[in-house]
Regions:
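Active-site/substrate-binding loop(s) of hydrolase catalytic cores
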Residues: 53-55, 68-69, 86-184, 188, ...
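Short glycine- and acidic-rich boundary segments immediately preceding or forming the N-terminal edge
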Residues: 1-44
């Protein structure tokens, strides 16, 4: 997985070091090159294995708080090197980290609990995320990380792009920009064999058709949004850039902590009532964070740093999202979906509070102890509500890696 003696999430530097070692080991097959720089000047690296024109592109690190992808990417690269049949007529290309600036700010390589995870939490504001910025920014304002990613897609014209994502607590699921027939079965078998629940009602894919449990296909343009207030649209993200060349994108999500409550297909007795209750709690929780932010802001020397930008951006989403849950019919009536919305409603204020807490702790601000108690309480309640259990890191990597390979094999049959 990495050059580390212990099993933990590798840093970007460690992923690059491991990729460089792979390239040195098989120089006839592998190349490692720089394809751009981040806003802060950090290099963006692409590892390529094989020389065939037909290509798979694997992207790690698009969300800095989802750390499994770097380790999975290295595992898939090893498999491709060791299994010749995966390279037959196909080259593989690995963007080692799509957002190295964000990765430098998320600092929980071996979290012991959800509270520990949130103490080092960072996830940038939406317009600063490389995959999502095209959905909210005009082309002339796209960050260099986005331009590097779309440039690689333009160069390689992959039949499949796989982007490696994760969730803090829940189950595993796949989002597809076009269906991949045959993927659902190996995905489900892999998850079951590793005791990872399949998240059948993921709020990220609310209202999308499913080609199998936990495998969601994005609706066609013009389909109504489950959450009308959300500023982004996946159909305007980099996920759809591969469509210009006849390709598609698979987003593979794996959990750090699993919950066996996320795959319950039973109908919820009152989903609309439940969503209205969750909306009320979301508003109440967000107000607690906003009060701390308003109190502390005059004392802070820099109110435009990345942690505060991201914290405030998350809080700004809350009123519209709460209104969506109150006034829009539920996209799904299952217990799994209502549970996923419950988790979403916990994450937004918890993440905003966590990033604000990091700023306050750095300044030794008097509001920090109170906010730290709130982050601890919310983290514990989140874990208790969903009966969180840690997924061994090797299982996170194995399941995500298997799903990447299965997607490539089944999408290749479609691409022929």
């Amino acid at each position: 997985m990495s050059l580390l003696p212990e099993l933990r999430y590798p840093t970007v530097t460690e992923v690059v070091t491991s990729a460089r070692a792979l390239a040195a080991r098989r120089p006839a097959l592998c190349t490692l090159r720089q394809i751009g720089r981040s806003r802060a000047g950090r290099p963006l690296h692409l590892l390529s294995v094989g020389h065939a024109r037909r290509a798979v592109l694997v992207v790690a690190g698009a969300h800095s708080n989802e750390p499994t992808g770097g380790a999975t990417l290295l595992d898939v690269a090893e498999r491709v090197l060791n299994e010749r049949e995966l390279r037959l007529g196909t080259s593989w290309h690995f963007l080692l980290c799509a957002d190295p600036d964000g990765a430098s700010l998320h600092i929980t390589p071996a979290p012991r609990s959800l509270f520990d995870y949130h103490l080092g939490f960072f996830r940038p504001a939406g317009h600063e995320q490389p995959e999502w910025s095209p959905a909210v920014l005009p082309p002339d304002r796209l960050p260099p990380e986005t331009r590097a990613l779309t440039g690689v897609i333009d160069e390689l014209r992959p039949y499949l792009q796989v982007t490696l994502h994760g969730t803090d607590l829940g189950g595993s699921w796949v989002q597809l920009t076009k269906d991949i027939p045959g993927l659902a079965e190996p995905f489900a078998k892999s998850a079951a064999g590793l005791n990872i629940p399949v998240e059948t009602g993921a709020s990220d894919a609310a209202g999308w058709p499913a080609s199998g449990p936990g495998v969601h296909v994005m609706p066609a343009p013009g389909a109504g949004a489950a959450y009308p207030s959300m500023p982004d649209d996946a159909r305007n993200s980099t996920w759809y850039h591969a469509h210009r060349y006849g390709g598609l994108t698979a987003i593979v999500e794996v959990p750090m902590w699993a919950s066996d409550l996320v795959d319950d297909p039973a109908p919820h007795p009152a989903p609309a009532v439940a969503l209205r209750r969750l909306a009320g709690r979301l508003l109440q929780d967000a107000r607690q964070v906003e009060r701390v932010l308003a109190d502390a802001t005059p004392r802070l020397p820099d109110v435009e740093g990345p942690l505060l930008r991201a914290s405030k951006w998350g809080l700004e989403l809350v009123p519209g999202l709460a209104a969506d849950w109150m006034h829009t019919p539920p996209a799904d009536n299952t217990r799994a979906y209502v549970g996923s919305v419950d988790a979403f409603a916990r994450r937004l204020p918890l993440r905003a509070a966590s990033m604000l807490l990091r700023v306050l702790l750095e300044q030794d601000d008097r509001a920090a102890p109170r906010l730290e108690r709130l982050v601890a309480t919310w983290s514990e309640a989140f874990a208790d509500r969903f009966r969180a259990r840690w997924v061994p890191l090797e299982h996170q990597i194995e399941h995500q890696s298997r799903t990447v390979v299965a997607a490539a094999i089944h999408a290749r049959a479609r691409a022929v």
